[in-house]
Amino acid sequence: MHKAGLLGLCARAWNSVRMASSGMTRRDPLANKVALVTASTDGIGFAIARRLAQDGAHVVVSSRKQQNVDQAVATLQGEGLSVTGTVCHVGKAEDRERLVATAVKLHGGIDILVSNAAVNPFFGSIMDVTEEVWDKTLDINVKAPALMTKAVVPEMEKRGGGSVVIVSSIAAFSPSPGFSPYNVSKTALLGLTKTLAIELAPRNIRVNCLAPGLIKTSFSRMLWMDKEKEESMKETLRIRRLGEPEDCAGIVSFLCSEDASYITGETVVVGGGTPSRL
C-alpha cells in the first residue's frame, strides 16, 4: 500500500475510534442531551431549539404564551424532532421551576441551558428612563438568566456537568442609540458569563455567550422593516446582508458540544463584521 494511502487509512481509523469513544457521531453531536431554551417559539430562540434538536438533543422550548409554545412544538415535532414545551415567564420563580421540573420529568435531567429571553421596553434618552423601566429590563435581561442558571446547575451536576449559553447582543459592544437600558443589560451579560464560567468550572459546567448583530426577527423589525432603513443598515456591515436566526443556531450548538469542551467564559459575536470589542 502506498504511504499516502496508509496514512489516510490510519487517519480515518483514528477518527472513528475518537468519535466512538465520545459516544456520538458527527451527525448527532448532541445525542441524548437535554436542552432548555427560553424564549424559543420565534426568531433566534426558535432557530436554536430546532438546531439543537436536529443535532440530537431532546429540547424543551418555552415562551410566555401557551399558544406560541403549542405552535412551535407542533412545527418541530412535525419535522421529526424530539421537542416538548411549557409556558415560562423567566421573571417568575414558579415558571422557572416548572421549566426545570418539566425537563427532569420528561427526560431525566438537564445538560444544556440557552438563556435567550429579553425585553426592550424603551426608546429614547437614558435621562428619560424611569425606575420602572430599569427594573423591568434588568429583571428579565440580567437577573433572570442568572437565576435560570442557578436553577439548572443542580441537575447538570447530577449528570456530570453541562453547558450554558447566554444570549447577549452586539449592543453590548456597540450601543444602539435610543436603547439605553437594553444596551446596559446586554453589556452586563458579558460580565455574568465570565463570572459564572469561573464559579461553575469546578462543577464541569461551561458558560459562554452569543452576541448576535442585526438578525432579521420580529424582535428587531423596527430596525429593518423599512427598505431604505434596511439598506442603510447593510452599509455598516462587512458582510452586506442582514443576519438570519439560523446564522446563530449553529454557533450555539457548537458551544454546547464536545467540540467546544475547552471553551468557557467567551463571547462569540455573530454580527456580519460589525465592530465588536470594548
Swiss-Prot record:
One of its GO terms (molecular function) is all-trans-retinol dehydrogenase (NADP+) activity. The modification N6-succinyllysine is found at K92, K216, K227, K234. Gene3D superfamilies: NAD(P)-binding Rossmann-like Domain. Induction: Induced by PPARA ligands clofibrate and Wy14,643. Inhibited by flavonoids (quercetin and genistein), cetylpyridium chloride, phenylhexane and valproic acid. Low inhibition is observed with fatty acids (myristic acid and lauric acid). No significant inhibition is observed with barbital, dicumarol, indomethacin, metyrapone, ethacrynic acid, disulfiram, hexestrol and benzodiazepines (diazepam and nitrazepam). InterPro entries: NAD(P)-bd_dom_sf, Sc_DH/Rdtase_CS, SDR_fam. The active site is at Y182. It catalyses: a secondary alcohol + NADP(+) = a ketone + NADPH + H(+); 3beta-hydroxy-5beta-pregnane-20-one + NADP(+) = 5beta-pregnan-3,20-dione + NADPH + H(+); 5beta-dihydrotestosterone + NADPH + H(+) = 5beta-androstane-3beta,17beta-diol + NADP(+); 5beta-androstane-3,17-dione + NADPH + H(+) = 3beta-hydroxy-5beta-androstane-17-one + NADP(+). A motif (Peroxisomal targeting signal) lies at residues 276-278. One of its GO terms (cellular component) is cytosol. It is an enzyme of class 1 (oxidoreductase). Disulfide bonds: none annotated. Substrate binds at S169. Primate DHRS4s display different stereoselectivity and catalytic efficiency in the oxidoreduction of some substrates as compared to other mammal DHRS4s due to a difference in conserved amino acid residues. Three homologous proteins DHRS4, DHRS4L1, and DHRS4L2 are derived from gene duplication of DHRS4, and the gene cluster is arranged in tandem in chromosome 14. The C-terminus peroxisomal targeting signal tripeptide is important for peroxisomal import. Once in the peroxisome, it is involved in intersubunit interactions. This is Dehydrogenase/reductase SDR family member 4.
